[in-house]
Every structure is written in C-alpha cells, then in structure tokens.
Amino acid sequence: MTVQERWVELADIKDELAARDWFPGTSGNLAIRVSDDPLTFLVTASGRDKRKRTNEDFVLVDATGQLIGEQSGKPSAETLLHVEIFNNTNATCSLHVHTVDNNVISELYAAQGHVTFTGQEIIKALGYWEETASVRIPIIENHADIPTLARAFAPHVTGDAGAVLIRNHGITVWGETPAAAKRYLEAYEFLFSYSLKLRALGVHS
C-alpha cells in the first residue's frame, strides 16, 4: 500500500478511537507500517489534538524512529515503542492509548506484574476460543526516559500480536493488521471496564 493509503487507514482508526474519548489531553499515539525494505512507518505527530483530522497528523519515520526528509511535525514521544514492535515482529499496526480504565487496572495489578482475565466472551476477539480461555497482559513500570521505557517494553514484544500495560501511563496493543490491532484494543478496554465495574459492586473478577 502507498503512504497515502496507509495514512487514510490510520486516520480512520484515530477518528474511531477519538470518538470514544481515548486521547485525553493530546495523549496517545498510533503507528502503521508502510514498507519493509527499508522499514518505514507512519506515527502520530507529537502534540496533535487527535479529535481533529488534519494533513499534519502523522509523520513518516525510518526503522529507528527518525524523520524521513523534511516534515512539519516531529514523532510522538513514544515512537521507540513502535520501533520495537515493527523491528521485531510482522505487525502492521500498533496503538497506544491512555484511558482511565487501563491506568487504574495497571495500578491495581502492578505489584504482580501482570493482569489475567479468564472466561469472558470478549476474549474470543483476541483469538482465544476455548470456554475457559485466559489472557494475560504484562505490566511494566513507567519511565520518563523513553529509551529506558523501550528497553523495559522490548522483552514483551514476542509475537505479531500482543499488548503491554505501562503503569499509570497506558496500553500499547499491536496486531497483524490495522483492523486486528483495533479489535484487540477494544477487547482489552472492554475487559478493563468490566473488571472495574465488578469491583465497584464489591465483586472481584
């Protein structure tokens, strides 16, 4: 696909997630693979209001996350997370959002380093079809220094689809296709919201 086709594909996903209010305060970032040899990808430009759609929403970067040629914006702060994903998997798209639910879940389960969900129907959206299927999401500590954060993130990038929670920060989800990445993100956020609603009722899932 061309850069422009990938741009439109990522912009459409951004619009959908923005409609859910998943980009508070210009937070979050999205990326989509454009080419493999050499590796290039589009990533959210830093500081953009993702509720608006403009011609400067994304920038094109290389395998190290550096801008390719002259562009008006600069890559999002967490571009190195997408660098890890695209250099080490065949994923096409990765999505990073900061929601209240994923931040609260990451804090509640930070001490054990992961959160596990079992037996929920929505887990099928992640590709697990057994009635008692479980999904485990690793939780890593947040680091203001992005290279340090990327090093903590890297060991969990082990397949073409996955997710990592960053404590009191957000979730990064990636998938084989843009549609898959969005579906996975929606499923994880459903699980987080469901779990927190049960807790509010005094029931622990």
From Swiss-Prot:
Pfam families: Aldolase_II (PF00596)
Single GO cellular component term: cytoplasm
Cofactor binding note of this UniProt entry: Binds 1 zinc ion per subunit.
Pathway assigned in UniProt: Amino-acid biosynthesis; L-methionine biosynthesis via salvage pathway; L-methionine from S-methyl-5-thio-alpha-D-ribose 1-phosphate: step 2/6
Extent of the signal sequence: none
Keyword field: Amino-acid biosynthesis, Lyase, Metal-binding, Methionine biosynthesis, Zinc
Cofactors that this protein relies on: Zn(2+)
Catalytic activity field: 5-(methylsulfanyl)-D-ribulose 1-phosphate = 5-methylsulfanyl-2,3-dioxopentyl phosphate + H2O
Role noted for this protein: Catalyzes the dehydration of methylthioribulose-1-phosphate (MTRu-1-P) into 2,3-diketo-5-methylthiopentyl-1-phosphate (DK-MTP-1-P).
Family the entry assigns: Belongs to the aldolase class II family. MtnB subfamily.
Protein name: Methylthioribulose-1-phosphate dehydratase
Native organism: Exiguobacterium sp. (strain ATCC BAA-1283 / AT1b)
